[in-house]
Amino acid sequence: MLFRSLHTHTRARVSYNAHPDASDGTPPDAVFTDPASPLSDGVSKTILPARLPSFPDYRWPAFLQGIIDYGNSPAQRDILLLGAATVLGSTLNKLVSFVYGRKHKYPCLQVFVTAPPASGKGALTWVRRLAEPIHNALLDTYREKIKTYRMEKTKWDTLGKEKANTPEPEQPQLKMLLIAGDNTGTGIQENLMDSGGVGLICETEADTVSTAIGGDHGHWSDLLRKCFDHDRLAYNRRTNHEYRECNVTFLCVLLSGTPAQIKPLKIGRAHV
C-alpha cells in the first residue's frame, strides 16, 4: 500500500462479548468471529482479538515523552508517538536528511493509523496542534504581504502612462504548512510549490482524503507516491502559458480511520 499502515489496534470488530484482558486500547468487549471454512467443522467460532506489538517502553526525549505520557494505554501511546514523529518531521523537513539507496531521505512520513471507532485514535487531533504555531505564523506573514501588495497594486493601476517604466507589483505566494485533505491534485501541487515543497496533510477521518481522491478533480494518489520518495512535481497550464515545478518535495501525511475506511482510498499493491 502507499501508506505505511500502522495497525495499533485490532483490525475489525464483529460482535460484543466480555473480554477479560483488554489493556491495549481495544474496546473491552471486542471479539472476532471466525467464519466457517471447508477445513473446519462448519461452525463459526468466536476468537479473541490478536495482540499486536507496541513500541518498547523507552525513555524518549523530554518534549516527546511529555506527549506520549498523555496516552492511557500502550496503543494510545503508540498513536501519540507516531503522530508526533510525523508532525515534527514536517516541521524539520529539509533541515534533516540522510542518504539511503544513493538518495537523500528526509523525516517526512506517511502514516495511516487504523482502529475501531471510539478506541483513542482521535488523540491525533491534539498532535496536529504541534504544527499550528508555524502554520499560523506563515498565514500571518502572508496576510501582511498581501495587504501591502494590494496597496502597491492600487497605486500602480493609477500610474497611467508611467506603467511602462514601473514594474508591476508581484503577488506574494500563499505559504502554509497544513494542507487540507479535501483538496484537488492541482490545489495540493500549488500549496506545495508555494511553500517550497513543504506540507502536512493531517486528517482524523480518512474519508476526507478518499472522497477527495475519488472526486472529479481529485486523483492525486500518484502525487502522494511521488512525495513519498521526495520526487519533483511539475505542471503546465496552457491558458496562460504558466509552467511551475518543485525539484524536491517534503510532504508528510497523517491519517486515521476505521478498517472500513481503508478500502475506499483505492490504493493497493498495484501502486506500490
Task: Set out the residue ranges of the language-model regions.
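Short, small-residue-biased leader/transition segments that mark boundaries at the very start
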Residues: 1-2
